[in-house]
């Protein structure tokens, strides 16, 4: 199968690339990962910055990062074929490696100068036949890493049945010297694995918080300050242009784009004498506001996938708990009953679960948990002392969050059942408020 690879190159204005990348360490994996051999590609192109271990190395790392694949070391491979024709099925089956899948590929010069043609095949040793084969023509050298992620997505979906997330991105805030007059806040966008981080916005003395992706991945909403008052902004990833969305008296916080991108939920305070925050929805075209709560302090709204419901946390019952809000009727229903405090709900893409922050005992750790919407059962996912700001990958397989067990906050990732734990250590400042992008074209 021939396939021309189309690339979207996003130009980030007024940004610079960080010199130190986040690194990933898997500290726990699933019990039965898929055994796979990613055979080194023929004539693989290696570059110390972009693809230090070649395109095949990117694929192997992606699959390992997911925790759902067990990669066979090259030293244990019975051979290193680069295409299906030279793959000796009997030799691999007799090697007793336990491998169920193999990936082979080859790279040749493209027909356009300084480009490459990349072919790969995914083979099943369960059925002794190829599952998929693709060719990508005239790939620029600086896009080989992206191509590796694209191939990983294909392999992931073919084997697991779910879309891969390796071409998605993370937005987060990195904070330096926040307790001093020289404190700076940076709004950063990186690849899903922390590689290729770019600073989209840098500010001194004006904190940045709560980044939230538009559904098309072109824009981030975030919270910062105007004249010492919290306000909600948007910033374009292609132009760097910023817009003020909400700068009402009181505080303006917790922005959340609706699934169709036409509205934004937010928490606003100062609308009455109590100064308690309430949930509002703004029509982004007309800027019309609709208020949905009026009792207790309410914040952290998040949309259901169908856009008909908001979940949020409220202290109306005496302690922070999770509630759902039907937008048509404006009626709210409490969802969480287990634990002392529950915060920051986010939907999984299938709409069946919420990922929340939970504190099960007074003075106990704050960890991530899943809340099943059918049973209201809560299942603890993480084991940190302070785990915050969960955000779910668009395929629903992974969660990114901020972990504060060390002196500096770091990013971490986990599966929904907690069987895969990945830490992405910060290289310098404290990392906080991660947000996982939607699928990107």
Please state what every model-predicted region is:
Residues 164-166, 215-216, 259-260, 305-306, ...:
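Residue-level detector of Asp-centered blade-edge/turn motifs that repeat once per structural unit
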Residues 126, 191-195, 236-240, 283-287, ...:
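Short loop/turn segments that connect beta-strands within beta-propeller blades
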Residues 27-90, 106:
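Short beta-strand->alpha-helix linker/helix-N-cap micro-motif
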Residues 22-23, 84-154:
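Amphipathic beta-strand/beta-sheet edge segments enriched in Tyr/Trp
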Residues 170, 217-220, 261-264, 307-311, ...:
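Hydrophobic beta-strand positions that form the internal "hydrophobic ladder"
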Residues 163, 175-186, 203-205, 223-232, ...:
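A flexible loop/linker signature enriched in serine peptidases of the S9 family
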Residues 412-441:
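Blade-level signature of beta-propeller repeat domains, shared across WD40, Kelch, NHL, RCC1
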């Amino acid at each position: 199968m021939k396939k021309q690879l189309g690339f979207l190159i996003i130009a980030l204005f007024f940004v610079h690339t960080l010199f130190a990348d986040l690194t990933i360490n898997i500290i726990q994996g699933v019990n039965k990962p898929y055994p796979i051999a990613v055979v080194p590609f023929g004539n693989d192109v290696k570059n110390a910055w972009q693809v230090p271990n070649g395109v095949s190395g990117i694929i192997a790392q992606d699959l390992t990062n997911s925790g759902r694949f067990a990669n066979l070391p090259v030293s244990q491979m019975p051979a290193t074929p680069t295409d299906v024709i030279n793959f000796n099925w009997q030799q691999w089956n007799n090697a007793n490696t336990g491998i169920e899948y193999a990936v082979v590929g080859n790279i040749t010069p493209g027909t356009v100068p300084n480009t490459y043609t990349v072919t790969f095949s995914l083979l099943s040793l369960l059925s002794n036949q190829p599952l998929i084969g693709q060719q990508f023509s005239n790939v620029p050298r600086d896009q080989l890493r992206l191509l590796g992620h694209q191939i990983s997505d294909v392999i992931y979906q073919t084997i697991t049945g779910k879309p891969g997330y390796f071409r998605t991105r993370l937005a987060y805030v990195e904070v330096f010297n926040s307790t001093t007059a020289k404190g700076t806040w940076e709004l950063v966008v990186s690849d899903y694995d922390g590689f290729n981080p770019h600073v989209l916005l840098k500010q001194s003395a004006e904190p940045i918080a709560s980044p939230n992706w538009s559904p098309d991945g072109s824009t981030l909403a975030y919270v910062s300050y105007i004249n010492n008052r919290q306000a909600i902004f948007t910033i374009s990833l292609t132009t760097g242009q910023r817009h003020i969305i909400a700068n009402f008296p009181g505080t303006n916080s917790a922005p959340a784009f609706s699934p169709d991108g036409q509205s934004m939920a937010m928490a606003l305070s100062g609308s009455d004498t109590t100064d308690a925050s309430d949930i509002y929805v703004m029509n982004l075209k007309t800027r019309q506001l609709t208020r949905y709560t009026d009792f207790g302090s309410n914040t952290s709204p998040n949309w259901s996938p169908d856009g008909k419901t908001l979940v949020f946390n409220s202290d109306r019952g005496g302690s922070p708990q999770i509630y759902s809000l039907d937008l048509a009727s404006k009626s709210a229903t409490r969802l969480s009953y287990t634990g002392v405090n529950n915060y920051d709900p986010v939907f999984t893409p299938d709409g069946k679960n919420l990922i929340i922050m939970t504190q099960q005992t007074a003075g106990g750790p704050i960890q991530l948990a899943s809340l099943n919407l059918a049973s209201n059962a809560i299942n603890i996912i993480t084991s940190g002392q302070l785990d915050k700001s969960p955000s779910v990958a668009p395929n629903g397989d992974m969660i990114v969050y901020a972990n504060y067990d060390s002196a500096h906050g770091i990013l971490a990732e986990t599966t929904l059942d907690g069987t895969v734990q990945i830490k992405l250590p910060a290289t310098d400042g404290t990392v906080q408020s991660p947000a996982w992008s939607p699928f990107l074209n």
